[in-house]
Amino acid sequence: SEENIVLAYRNICKSKGSFTAGVDGKIITDIQKYPIQTVVQKVRNKLNYYQPKKVLRTYIDKGNGKQRPLGIPSIWDRLIQQCVLQILEPICEAKFHERSNGFRPYRSAQNAVAQCYKMIQLQNLHYVVDIDIKGFFDNINHAKLIRQIWAMGIQDLKVLAIIKAMLKADILFNDIVISPETGTPQGGILSPLLSNIVLNELDWWVASQWETIPTPVSYTH
């Protein structure tokens, strides 16, 4: 809708990442020169037969001395990703586990720590499981992800087709074009939400195995 595109445009304008150019060299100021109605029409035209530009891959340093791959979409693709995010996020937020805190609105590591304290005090839970999935973002299975999005209740075929196109967008790195079979680039606006969709089943399973599993002892306080 026009309202969704305008809201996405306003959110993109407030993002520092919008001043980082993708493969076409354009940033948010290149969009801001157009009247808002022109921006809306351009987005609508792109969505009719959506084909994203290549994602520019770069690397940033991590705290442990290693590097993390970062995918930078073109500014117009960032705007379209924001439009899709605003459609998906309210639906998915209602389905995510209450203990999930990563990459979610109004949640942080502080929320996770507070939840841990509460579970220790009220539920007598004292174990922490530390899991690190190697190369997680780069190894997400596209077909399974689309099925998980469908299971979330997002079943509009046009929206799903746009997400598929985003996932299959070519990656440009050092003049080499890579056609991804798996993964979603870190740096994309939609990637954090997609990663949470992938992990949602795991969140609920972990809770069923520890937090909510019936115990032979009834704890009282």
Language-model region placement:
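Non-catalytic, polymerase-adjacent accessory regions of viral genome-replication enzymes
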Residues: 1-37
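Conserved small/polar residues in nucleotide/adenosyl-binding loops
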Residues: 220-221
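Reverse-transcriptase-like RNA-dependent polymerase core
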Residues: 42-66, 75, 79-87, 114-122, ...
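Conserved catalytic palm subdomain of right-hand nucleotidyl-transferase polymerases, strongest
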Residues: 18-27, 71, 110-149
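Conserved pre-motif C helix in the palm subdomain of viral-like polymerases
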Residues: 67-96, 182-209
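Conserved short loop/turn motifs at secondary-structure junctions
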Residues: 25-31, 100-106, 132-137, 182
